[in-house]
Design a protein with these regions (language model features):
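TRNA-recognition modules of translation machinery and tRNA-sensing kinases, especially anticodon-binding
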Residues: 8-171
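Short, small-residue-biased leader/transition segments that mark boundaries at the very start
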Residues: 1-7
Length: 171
């Protein structure tokens, strides 16, 4: 584990080549489909070039967290990700290799999860504000990543592909 931050999170660094079977067990190998880069090691064990790290991290936490007293546990990493994008483009949009910060929260119940989620969302808002980036937090489709709820921070740009509606009278 790495350094502890203001919301009690810890920085980690996970393998870029986890075993493919973790993604197969979760069903995400099928969901990602041809977006996955796969290969085999010298013993012919299938590996995946990680498009995300949920399976590997969940297996690690399952093996090492033995009590609710160890929770909440908030882990994050800034890591290079790889996806075989169907329409790669230049610049920072839709590239096959990109850096991403992902954060994961393990909590005792759904209420505690909501507290962790709100703290992380506020931490992101603070970072964007310090950088002078006028982002908008929007509801998002969790897609292949999965999950009950998902949000994205959008920075308005003419080169983007998404269209959003903004209500000037809403929060």
């Amino acid at each position: 584990m790495g350094s502890e931050r203001c919301i009690g999170d810890r920085e980690i660094r996970l393998s870029v080549l986890p075993p493919l079977d973790l993604s197969e067990q979760s069903g995400r190998a099928e969901i990602f489909g041809s977006d996955l880069f796969t290969l085999a090691d010298r013993r012919d064990r299938p590996l995946v070039v990680a498009p995300a790290h949920e399976e590997l991290l969940t297996a690690m936490v399952k093996a090492n967290v033995n009590s609710y007293r160890d929770l909440p546990l908030i882990l994050y990493q800034i890591h290079t990700k790889f996806r075989d994008e169907p329409r790669p483009r230049g610049g920072l949009i839709r590239v096959r290799e990109f850096d991403m910060m992902d954060a994961y929260s393990f909590d005792v119940d759904e209420e505690a999860l909501d507290v962790s989620y709100r703290a992380m969302a506020q931490a992101y808002r603070n970072i964007y504000a310090r950088c002078g980036l006028p982002v908008i937090m929007v509801d998002a489709d969790s897609g292949a990543i999965g999950g009950k709820e998902s949000n994205e921070f959008i920075l308005l740009a003419d080169s983007g592909e998404d269209t959003i509606l903004i209500c000037e009278q809403c929060e």
